[in-house]
């Protein structure tokens, strides 16, 4: 072999070895860089060439085991005997290799609202001018009205709340559990006697074995019901009076297992068949404010709160309670008998009347004349007239179509 050719071949091997070292360093930098995936995609787009040596023409095995693109081999220029020069395509000198860019570290905390100090100063001036203008408007308003305008919004809110009074304040819920065999009414009244505030019944759940409901006037008296009844609703209230007692009453709606629904004002007792749970609420009334708002008409009932009681006046359930409070409503249900027209009844569920959707078995009720319910505007005893309808029902007549009573709608 010619000495020049051997020297040239030796230089090629050295350059190739140096180039492989540079490529390995670049690969290690790419692996440690956060932008490795992006650079890897960029290398996949580069053209790949199969390098061959000019002297032997044999393929050089790749040293990266196929993980990266094959390394480009040097291309030789014709040897003129003076110098040898190898050109490596896609080769980058070591001085041109730069370190990867480090990601910018984000500062912890809330970002600044204003980027420059000038913007912050302008915003501060704008806020100060707005506050000064609002203060000027308040002073002008005080000069016009001849008074002082409070700059504290919290004090104005407190004054508004203070003007409402103490009515309905100190509302506290209570749960009363009643064992089987005990009287629900007696338990509620005992709780009302122990409490120093007004009391109302919110809801109740459980079963009743024996109930006593008030009959409508003029017959009066109580009508007993025995059996297994489910409590649909229980409502009522007890209000303190000037004499130190409490007036009020309770009303109940019961449902039997056969589908009958009865209800009305409780007469004397309501015996629990199983565990009964009653939810009560105590609250406070502002009687001084109510007395001042009544205008001082001299009526004794104006000194207290005028609330409608579900029980008529008289001794409540034999417990020695003072008479009930004044009732201002009327029952829109009236009969055909003219002798009953002078009676004024209480409005809503819980009045002295009881209602019955279906007649209970074992109890036969007789009526001298069919009762009629009218909801039209011609009724003189119905303060809420103008309903625009006229319904009439007959009680005590059996019908195969609608069960225990027959309903007729006139033309």
UniProtKB/Swiss-Prot annotation:
Q: Where is the composition biased (Low complexity)?
A: 20-29, 120-135, 144-159
The alphabetized UniProt keywords are: DNA-binding, Nucleus, Transcription, Transcription regulation
Q: Where is this region: Disordered?
A: 1-32, 54-164, 289-348, 366-411
Intracellular or extracellular location(s): Nucleus
Task: Give the Pfam families listed for this entry.
Answer: PCC
InterPro entries found in the cross-reference section = AHL, PPC_dom
Comp. bias regions, Gly residues = 374-390
As one GO molecular function, the record gives:
minor groove of adenine-thymine-rich DNA binding
Q: Where is the composition biased (Polar residues)?
A: 54-66, 306-315
What residue intervals hold the motif Bipartite nuclear localization signal? 105-113
Query: Could you tell me what this protein does?
Result: Transcription factor that specifically binds AT-rich DNA sequences related to the nuclear matrix attachment regions (MARs).
**What protein name is recorded for this chain?**
AT-hook motif nuclear-localized protein 14
Classification from the root reads: Eukaryota, Viridiplantae, Streptophyta, Embryophyta, Tracheophyta
